[in-house]
Amino acid sequence: MASASPAIMESGTASSDEAQAAARQPAVEIAHLSKTYGALTAVDDVSFSVAEGEIFGILGPNGAGKTTTVECAIGLRSPDAGTIRLLGLDPLTQRDDVREVVGVQLQFGALPDKLKVREILDMYRSFYTEPADVGELIKVLGLTEKLGDYYKALSGGQRQRLSVALALIGNPKIAVLDEMTTGLDPQARRDTWDLIRGVRDRGVTIVLVTHFMEEAERLCDRVALIDSGRLVALDTPARLAAQARGGKQVRFVPSDRFDDRLLTSLPEVSAVQHDGQHVVVNGSGDLVNAVILQLAAAGITARDVELVSLNLEDAFVKLTGRHATEGAMS
């Protein structure tokens, strides 16, 4: 397989925080990781490292290879090629040592239906010599009133919150969280973000797998964008968004219908799309004036004109040609 070359790598002058992170021992090291299922290449020569104390995001649409990457990283799957180290440990040959330092919450984890929430927490707590404060975890995650409920009676969102608690209950040095806020309401999602920030502030390294761009922008120090099993970009959310802002985007409502070629003929315009009654134009240079003047010359008025500020989602679309909520496979 060809070696993956990220389309965007870290650039510019590193901040003092980034310099300190680079000087620390990597908590996670993945080199040339590949995994196939028959004719399907799920992970294609992916390499990255995560510094101790960093919140590192792995982003991409459903089916991009994110979950397979972390399942190989924690030893649940054997890669076809590549090396993985977690705090210097091999997750395949040093499983017991890895379990002592890594907490995991997987997207499709399941627990016994006939156990109560309290029993599950007590069972997991007993696995560790220095467990976390369970009361604090369940309070932040909104599970206090569910302690006496059976697992089978929990909603999808409640099961998700319990799985996050179980990943953190052992006071791990590395926490791997796969789609941790899927199924949560907006307030519960933000409460969970606050919890994760607090965990990181205590020195825990967080590997966060998500397709929620806002979550990555708010939480992550750096993000790896993965699409079709390949690493397409690796940088801070701010710098990835800044790359997307190398272009411009304007939205407006036209007073009358027009042929897209009216605008695509302009040198400043790279693309024209339609979003309901709005027209969305991407381009560069003096885009707004060029579009408005061209429309006016054709007798068309641009109403509700908005110059859009681009973000991490736009960076992902620019790099992959699709949104993170899209997916090719389950």
Language-model regions: role of each:
Residues A42, G103, R125, T129, ...:
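A generic structural signal for secondary-structure junctions
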Residues K114, E136, D304, E326-A328:
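Short, hydrophobic secondary-structure boundary micro-motifs
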Residues M1-S34, R322-S330:
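ABC-family P-loop ATPase nucleotide-binding domain
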Residues Q25-I30, K35-S228, A233:
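ABC transporter nucleotide-binding domains
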Residues D194-N282:
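ABC transporter nucleotide-binding domain
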Residues G246-R322, S330:
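Short, charged/small-residue-rich alpha-helical element at the C-terminal edge
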